[in-house]
């Protein structure tokens, strides 16, 4: 089987059998069976996910990461390899990321067997990127303590860039992702005696209005930030004063100072609800992923490796505003660099975005990814 047949076979198998974050048991077994077939040793620090290692001839150790989880989305692609799991789909391309790393493992094993593997390589098949912070979990579990990793590399398919294009950016390339929730508690009464109640309905309207004004009045308009309201609710019946209210959303920013401003404003909003409406209001934050920071020291190696892989490099002027837990590797483990690989092909209908029910791409783009990985390995220099 040639390499294109390899990536097509394995990617489509994984696409048919997607699993949600922290439940990637079959996917993990599939990866382990593949590694076993190559006689490669590996560790499983968590219930799902795999860390493999190959010793090379050099003194440097570098790591490559692929995320392996899927999303709770009903696939609508009419293809033979459509998801066989109800309402679970590889709608973010992690099946491709995993497959590319599998083939790269095989290439590295062939090099090792020939005595030509230039450096030590750690292969990270990471669980729970979507909703579990799998990268942080692995680091906290000590998964990398025995490896003197000097750099971590990763990619993500990008349906907004054409095939043959690699999108890069030094410093911030993805935003932080922080969830927030407002909890309101008032006093119910019949609508005929509404003056005896403390309405969470009007209080929630106030919260909505104030949140929508944070971006306009408190953040620098030249920076890209998102303060998004995703869901809200007040009350249970049409003829009673609402005694409870709830609102939740997400904050996306690549500047820690801006995130602090948003949080401070939300705390002030919660305090104002008590004063204005006599309604208790609490805001809670679920810390998500920090911004992904690409080390400028790795830029030259990245760009050279991409060009040698026949990819055209596009330097993105601003970060993406979605979150990515690859950020934890650069924050806690070693200098890191994350690249987006274009998969858009209008002739083949591969045009829909990430996290959509029609996401798909041509497996041939994965060969470019593997060539990029190998170029990095062959020409790696410590930074």
Curated annotation (Swiss-Prot):
Q: Does the keyword Transmembrane apply?
A: no
Its lineage opens with: Bacteria, Bacillati, Bacillota, Bacilli, Bacillales
Q: Which InterPro entries match?
A: Amidohydrolase, Bact_exopeptidase_dim_dom, Peptidase_M20, Peptidase_M20_dimer
**Can you tell me which family this protein belongs to?**
Belongs to the peptidase M20 family.
Q: What is this protein called?
A: Uncharacterized hydrolase SACOL1433
What keywords are assigned to this protein?
Answer: Hydrolase
Q: Name one GO molecular function term.
A: hydrolase activity
Q: Which Gene3D superfamilies match?
A: 3.30.70.360, Zn peptidases
Q: Which Pfam families match?
A: M20_dimer, Peptidase_M20
EC number(s) recorded for this UniProt protein: 3.-.-.-
């Amino acid at each position: 089987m040639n390499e294109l047949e390899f990536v097509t076979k394995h990617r489509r198998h994984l696409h048919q059998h997607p699993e949600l974050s922290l439940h990637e048991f079959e996917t993990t077994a599939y990866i382990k069976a593949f590694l076993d077939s190559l006689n490669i040793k590996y560790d499983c620090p968590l219930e799902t996910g795999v860390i493999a290692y190959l010793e090379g001839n050099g003194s440097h150790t570098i790591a490559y990461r692929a995320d392996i989880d899927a999303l709770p989305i009903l696939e609508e692609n009419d293809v033979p390899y459509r998801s066989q799991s109800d309402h679970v789909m590889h709608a973010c391309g992690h099946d491709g990321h995993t497959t590319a790393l599998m083939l790269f493992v095989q290439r590295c094993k062939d090099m090792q067997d020939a005595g030509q593997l230039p450096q030590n390589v750690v292969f990270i098949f990471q669980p729970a990127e979507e909703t579990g912070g799998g990268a942080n979990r692995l680091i906290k579990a000590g998964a990398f303590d025995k490896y003197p990793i000097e750099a971590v590399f990763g990619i993500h398919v990008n349906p907004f860039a054409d095939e043959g294009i690699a999108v890069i950016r030094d410093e911030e390339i993805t935003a932080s992702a922080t969830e927030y929730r407002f909890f309101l508690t008032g006093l119910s009464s019949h609508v005929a005696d509404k003056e005896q109640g403390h309405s969470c309905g009007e209080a929630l309207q106030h919260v909505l209005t104030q949140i929508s004004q944070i971006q306009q009045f408190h953040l620098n308009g030249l920076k890209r930030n998102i303060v998004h309201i995703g869901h809200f609710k007040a009350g249970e019946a049409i003829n009673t004063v609402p005694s409870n209210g709830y609102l939740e959303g997400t904050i996306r920013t690549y500047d820690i100072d801006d995130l602090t401003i948003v949080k401070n404003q939300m705390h002030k909003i919660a305090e104002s609800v008590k004063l204005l409406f006599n309604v208790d209001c609490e805001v809670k934050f679920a810390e998500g992923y920090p911004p992904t920071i690409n080390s400028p020291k790795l830029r030259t190696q990245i760009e050279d490796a991409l060009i040698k892989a026949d990819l055209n490099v596009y330097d993105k002027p601003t970060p993406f505003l979605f979150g990515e837990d690859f950020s934890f590797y650069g924050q806690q483990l070693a200098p890191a660099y994350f690249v987006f690989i274009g998969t858009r092909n209008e002739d083949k209908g591969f045009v829909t975005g990430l996290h959509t029910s029609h996401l798909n791409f041509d497996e041939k783009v994965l060969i470019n990814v593997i060539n990029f990985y190998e170029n990095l390995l062959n020409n790696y220099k410590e930074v």
